[in-house]
Amino acid sequence: MMARRDPKSWAKRLVRAQTLQKQRRAPVGPRAPPPDEEDPRLKCKNCGAFGHTARSTTCPMKCWKAALVPATLGKKEGKENLKPWKPRGEANPGPLNKDKGEKEERPRQQDPQRKALLHMFSGKPPEKPLPNGKGSTESSEHLRVASGPMPVHTTSKRPRVDPVLADRSATEMSGRGSVLASLSPLRKASLSSSSSLGPKERQTGAAADIPQPAFRHQGPEPLLVVKPTHSSPEGGCREVPQAASKTHGLLQAARPQAQDKRPAVTSQPCPPAATHSLGLGSNLSFGPGAKRPAQAPIQACLNFPKKPRLGPFQIPESAIQGGELGAPENLQPPPAATELGPSTSPQMGRRTPAQVPSVDWQPPHSTPCLPTAQACTMSHHPAAGHDGAQPLRVLFRRLENGRWSSSLLAAPSFHSPEKPGAFLAQSPHVSEKSEAPCVRVPPSVLYEDLQVSSSSEDSDSDLE
């Protein structure tokens, strides 16, 4: 019967019985695997330990309840400061403590200069400083006065003071102390307060006396001034400089001192007229066509006025339109025809009556002409109430190419109506001479040409 049994089945039963016995005998905690079962090349993904995989039953993550708590490795008394060092005795102090002790023990030596200062300001004998140095700080509280710098400092470290400054301050304070010593305490306090307030008041007073500039010019700006030749009861002359810029276009005032140093030039055949532009030469011409007018050569000469005159006058709209025509293209005065008249500038835009220039009163000065690109406009009529003077007039001439040029003369030729909406413009005296023949044109033709030119200029500026 036993021989007939299969040996394989018997072996299987034996293995099962052995495994059951091993499971029963196994301890509650995790069993440490034998060294032959551990493979250092394996790493568990759950706990991160080497020697087993995540499927292994030895992983502490699977049998967490049976995991062992890591025990302490024992106490190390060497790391714990159970016996701290005792403080060093005073008999053998260290180098740092020795220096510190010497500074605290020895009192701060007071020189005779400091004693004199203490006696001056406090009126009491100086107190003896304590060994810890606190008395010196308390006794010098009253020395902090705003009257001036003092060489006395209350810090423990004494700074280096220049001997020259120390001697000077000592003499000043000693002289001041002799005066204060004879006064009562109330007067001392009042003097100290006044001395502390003195520098501030002087500073404010000096700041108040500083003149502030009225205008600030942005870059070199040409000036244009027109001055009448009418007589006035007040006497003197009034000049209104005009400064034009690209952005603002406002009129600004020029100082009268800048024109006193200019040389005087006299012209021979010039009638007494008045214009002045800061330029050696400028061109102006008026054209009836829609195109931009070509410029005619103009040059100015100078002449002394007989006496200073003053006269307010207004500018008609036709004169303003004529003065705002195209910009000059060449500023080289040819020797042919020399005339002075209104010229325009690319920097000057259209002005409104609200932009009125300021007025400076000064005696007349004859000045040479300089190059300018400003528009010069003036009235053709004198002010009411002026007697014995010739009014200003503008003479317009027709050139060969059909253009117009203007010049100032003394004899009256025609009168244009004044309008209240025009603004004022004046300039210093400049007389002129003209070598070209004069051709008189009726005012109606002139006004028509000016209106056509101004309309064409407006259309060109709009297109640009």
Curated annotation (Swiss-Prot):
Composition bias type Low complexity, residue spans: 180-197
Protein's UniProt name: Protein FAM90A10
Signal peptide from the UniProt entry: none
Name of encoding gene: FAM90A10
Region of interest (Disordered), ranges: 1-42, 69-373, 415-437
Family annotation (Pfam families): zf-CCHC_6
Transmembrane segments: none
Family, as annotated: Belongs to the FAM90 family.
InterPro entries cross-referenced by the UniProt entry: FAM90, Znf-CCHC_6
Lineage top rank: taxon: Eukaryota
Compositional bias ranges of the Basic and acidic residues kind: 74-89, 97-114
